[in-house]
UniProtKB/Swiss-Prot annotation:
Component of the EKC/KEOPS complex that is required for the formation of a threonylcarbamoyl group on adenosine at position 37 (t(6)A37) in tRNAs that read codons beginning with adenine. The complex is probably involved in the transfer of the threonylcarbamoyl moiety of threonylcarbamoyl-AMP (TC-AMP) to the N6 group of A37. KAE1 likely plays a direct catalytic role in this reaction, but requires other protein(s) of the complex to fulfill this activity. The EKC/KEOPS complex also promotes both telomere uncapping and telomere elongation. Its EC number is 2.3.1.234. Substrate binds at Y145, V146, S147, G148, G149, D177, G192, E196, N287. Pfam families: TsaD (PF00814). A divalent metal cation binds at H124, H128, Y145, D315. It comes from the Eukaryota. Belongs to the KAE1 / TsaD family. The gene is KAE1. This is tRNA N6-adenosine threonylcarbamoyltransferase. It is an enzyme of class 2 (transferase). Component of the EKC/KEOPS complex composed of at least BUD32, CGI121, GON7, KAE1 and PCC1; the whole complex dimerizes.
């Protein structure tokens, strides 16, 4: 029995996360021949006033200001007094926002050289998937990856996470965030969460554009349309079928439309690969209504839905630590000269050689 430790750093958007994970290997030849222990999972979020998004330069400044303190807290909580005992430093290499990514990469390079520990660059999406699989116990699910910057339907095949469908323009989380700005919905704890709470009070469904093209979907049109409705609402001039539409109705209608599109393409992928499992990952995956709608579809197919809570579905350092350690145990290491971050790092570029 052998134990391995990894420290992970995540900072691809407005959340800065640092986590420490331990793998205890009991059978090195088996894909699942190890157990995981989460030793720490610390996160700090850059939050802007209602009606405002977060700019890359300001987000990067937040990460630079907090990263040392967050690393210290993560090590203290994990009870690691000698960080040279870590087996690897894992960091998000992409995709994401350039400036925040760069801030975290610099921190990873610095501590790796200070402590003499190898670096492992991690694909952000693969981190979400592997953490989701570990936490939920899903074996070989179709993955719906939904966040502020990404929307993809994924399935595993031949040591790659294959993309079956994705957004053609903006991500579902970005659509929700931008709508929240129009209505000046608060950004704390997140605009998507606040939209979800308002949607629970919505009673009137307002028809919105529904754009699914094969296995792909488009959300820029529905955003533009619902933004125009929101401006009419703010002017007190939004009546549908004799009903005075409220902000809650608009939130409800937007959620129902977007999530129906996601359920449709996910079901089509399940049918294609003959899967009975759906794993929802990414920040939007915390949404209970999305989980409910996906569950209705899955039950109709005698399947099941897997999702994690906000500790793991929202961007975090522990998922990066976990995915990085999986790769490191297979002999992967990112040389210092190859640690440049990239905003375009496709999920299917990663060789997933820790799976059979």
């Amino acid at each position: 029995m052998t134990t391995y430790l990894s420290l992970g750093l995540e900072g691809s958007a407005n959340k800065l996360g640092v986590g420490v994970i331990k793998h205890t290997v009991t059978d090195a030849n088996a894909e699942n021949g190890f157990s995981t222990d989460i030793l720490s999972n610390i996160r700090d979020t850059y939050i802007t006033p209602p009606g405002e998004g977060f700019l890359p330069r300001d987000t990067a400044r937040h990460h630079r200001n907090w990263v040392v303190r967050i690393i210290k807290r993560a090590l203290d909580e994990a009870k690691i007094s000698d960080p040279t005992k870590l087996h690897c430093i894992s960091f998000t290499q992409g995709p994401g926002m350039g400036a925040p990514l760069q801030s975290v990469v610099i921190a990873a390079r610095t501590i790796a050289q200070m402590w003499g520990v190898p670096l492992v660059g991690v694909n952000h999406c693969v981190g979400h998937i592997e953490m989701g699989r570990t936490i939920t116990g899903a074996t070989n699910p179709v993955v719906l990856y939904v966040s502020g910057g990404n929307t993809q339907v994924i399935a595993y095949s031949k040591q790659r996470y294959r993309i079956f469908g994705e957004t053609l323009d903006i991500a579902v989380g970005n659509c929700l965030d931008r709508f929240a700005r129009v209505l000046k919905i608060p950004n704390a704890p997140s605009p998507g969460y606040n939209i979800e709470q308002l949607a629970k009070k919505g009673k009137k469904y307002v028809p919105l554009p529904y754009t699914v093209k094969g296995m792909d979907l488009s959300m820029s049109g529905v955003l533009q349309f619902v933004e125009s409705l929101a401006k009419r609402f703010q002017a007190g001039d939004l009546v549908v079928d004799g009903h005075q539409v409220t902000a809650e109705d608009l939130c409800f209608s937007l959620q129902e439309t977007l999530f129906a599109m996601l359920v449709e393409i996910t079901e089509r992928a399940m049918a294609h690969v003959n899967s009975q499992q759906v794993l929802i990952v990414g920040g939007v995956g915390c949404n209970e209504r999305l989980q409910e709608m996906m569950g209705i579809m899955a039950r109709d197919r005698n399947g099941s839905v897997y999702a994690t809570d906000e500790r793991f579905c929202i961007d975090n350092g522990i998922m990066i630590a976990h995915a990085g350690l999986l790769a490191w145990r297979q002999g992967f290491e990112t040389k210092m000269e190859k640690t440049q971050c990239t905003q375009r790092f496709r999920t299917d570029e990663v060789l997933v050689d820790w799976r059979v």
